[in-house]
A protein has these predicted regions:
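Conserved PRPP/pyrophosphate-binding segment of the phosphoribosyltransferase/PRPP-pathway fold
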Residues: 1-76, 86-114
Length: 114
């Protein structure tokens, strides 16, 4: 799952992406590794930002905390909502450093502008 900052998860009491991932874990019978990625910075909320602002805001916000857990494995990265893809892109860039066999993305919702 896409991690939250410790402060955000503490104030919220849960990580919505991890809740979704745990549901997939039960249905798909595959393990969830919530400690593979770590969110480093407490950034501004991205809900009101455009794509360029989101891309700048999210740079260097994640680190790969457990390379061995993903080496040569097929990864399904779970997030609740994809708006511009900036967060998922930043996470994928980190995950690639662990040499996974593949990375796929799953979101509950995707924001689309018409």
């Amino acid at each position: 799952p896409v991690p939250l900052t410790r402060e955000r998860q503490s104030s919220r009491g849960y990580n919505q992406s991890e809740v979704l991932a745990k549901g997939l874990e039960m249905e798909m019978k595959v393990p969830v590794y919530p400690a593979v990625l770590e969110r480093l910075k407490s950034k501004s909320s991205q809900t009101k930002m455009g794509r360029e602002e989101r891309l700048k805001n999210i740079i260097q916000s994640f680190r790969l905390a457990n390379r061995e857990a993903i080496r040569d494995r097929h990864i399904l990265l779970v997030d609740d909502v994809m708006t511009t893809g900036a967060t998922l892109d930043a996470c994928c860039q980190c995950l690639l450093g662990g040499n996974p066999a593949s990375i796929r993305l799953a979101t509950l919702a995707m924001a689309v502008n018409y």
